[in-house]
């Protein structure tokens, strides 16, 4: 039976995502930033850098949220170091995760397609066949 190997970076990434999620939640409240949640963390092989992907509850304020997180990244890293028992805590680089927005857009397009109904699509197909 093949076993799935877990690399240290995967384990550290999962732990950073859990701990940083809690830390960011508190920091957002304390610093008056728009609400965000940590959706994913990618850590470099040498554990020196972490790409932290966040999603904003208010998409129009996402740039403001990411900018605010970048400004307090040093404080967040210090709090993360206290929470984790690592010799070296990765440098945090915040990025907006637009996958939720893209998924919502696709969902809306599919709903619009359902609203059009099968009559419109069959007449389009008839026109293409001529």
From Swiss-Prot:
Organism: Xanthomonas axonopodis pv. citri (strain 306)
Summary of subunit composition and partner proteins: Monomer. Binds 30S ribosomal subunits, but not 50S ribosomal subunits or 70S ribosomes.
Keywords: Cytoplasm, Ribosome biogenesis
Protein name: Ribosome-binding factor A
GO terms classed as biological process: maturation of SSU-rRNA
GO molecular function term, any single one: ribosomal small subunit binding
Localization per Swiss-Prot or TrEMBL: Cytoplasm
Region span, Disordered: 111-130
Annotated Pfam families: RBFA
Cellular component terms per the entry's GO annotation: cytosol
Chain's role: One of several proteins that assist in the late maturation steps of the functional core of the 30S ribosomal subunit. Associates with free 30S ribosomal subunits (but not with 30S subunits that are part of 70S ribosomes or polysomes). Required for efficient processing of 16S rRNA. May interact with the 5'-terminal helix region of 16S rRNA.
Gene3D superfamilies: 3.30.300.20
Domain of life: Bacteria
Family: Belongs to the RbfA family.
InterPro entries named among the record's database cross-references: KH_dom-like_a/b, RbfA, RbfA_dom_sf, Ribosome-bd_factorA_CS
Gene: rbfA
Primary localisation category: cytoplasm
NCBIfam families per record: rbfA
């Amino acid at each position: 039976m093949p076993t799935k190997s877990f690399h240290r970076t995967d384990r550290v990434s999962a732990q950073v995502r859990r701990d940083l999620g809690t830390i960011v939640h508190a920091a957002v409240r304390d610093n008056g930033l728009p609400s965000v949640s940590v959706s994913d963390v990618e850590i470099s092989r040498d554990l020196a850098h972490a790409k932290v992907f966040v999603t904003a509850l208010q998409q129009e304020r996402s740039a403001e949220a990411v900018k605010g997180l970048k400004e307090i990244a040093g404080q967040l890293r210090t709090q993360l170091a206290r929470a984790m028992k690592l010799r070296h805590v990765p440098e945090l680089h915040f990025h907006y995760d637009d996958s939720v927005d893209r998924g919502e857009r696709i969902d809306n397009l599919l709903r619009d397609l359902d609203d059009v109904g099968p009559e419109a699509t069959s007449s389009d197909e008839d026109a293409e066949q001529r």
